[in-house]
Amino acid sequence: MKRTNSKIDLTLDYHAHVLPGCDHGSDSVETSRKQLAMAAAARVRTVCATPHFYPHRESIPSFLQRREASARLLRENLTADAPQLQLGAEVLICDGMERLDGLPRLCRGETNELLLEMPFYQWPEAIWDTLYALCERRDIEIVLAHAERYSPEAIEQLIRDNVALQLNSECLTRPLHRKRYLTWIKNGSVKYLGSDIHMLGNGYRAWEICRNLLRE
């Protein structure tokens, strides 16, 4: 069934690398505090921490242990006015990972949404097969990370197949291809925006531009 709700919650940053030392997104608690302060200034109330998870390199229990330790350290050092922190993961697709036990433990917070990263080369048949096998699982819902980075033809196919998309806010600040992304948003295919912040980068400067474009 085709989505019709095109409204995006800009108080939620769905994709952010803010856990200190958990991946290359933040090198310290101080960096993470600055990241979250910038999020708060952009009127973001909830940040979903989505450190990279590579199934071919690490087990799910090992990853979750590292993530929890990093999140605990950060929470102990946050001020009361900091955005709420949710835990998730940016999971790199691997051939056959639909058979991996424990995938729901990588979903965002208490939801069944799994943020899935695809390869940046042309997807071979085996990856397509894995993607569709993941979509058929009843215990998770796939959300495709930074969909603007992949082949438009592949994304259009996934839109027809009703796979939910996440866009990085930065892509809406550039005129090139913006019309395409706004069309995806208007037709309800884009479920979330994310900063995909690594270190301090450009912070959340794109967030206000997105807010104006989407008339929030």
Describe every region a protein language model picked out.
Residues 189-205:
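Short acidic/histidine-rich active-site segments
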Residues 59-161, 166:
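Extended substrate/RNA-proximal surfaces in nucleic-acid metabolism proteins
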Residues 54-57, 93-94, 148-153, 173-175, ...:
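Active-site environment of divalent metal-dependent phosphoester hydrolases
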Residues 3, 207-216:
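Mid-to-C-terminal alpha-helical segments outside catalytic/metal-binding sites
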Residues 175-185:
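Short loop-to-alpha-helix "cap/lid" segments that border enzyme active sites
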Residues 40, 136, 185-186:
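Non-catalytic positions within long, well-ordered alpha-helices that form the structural scaffold/packing
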Residues 11-14, 47-50, 86-90, 142-145, ...:
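Active-site neighborhood of phospho(di)ester-bond hydrolases with catalytic His/Asp-centered motifs
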Residues 1-82:
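An N-terminally biased module of ancient metal coordination in phosphate/nucleic-acid-related enzymes
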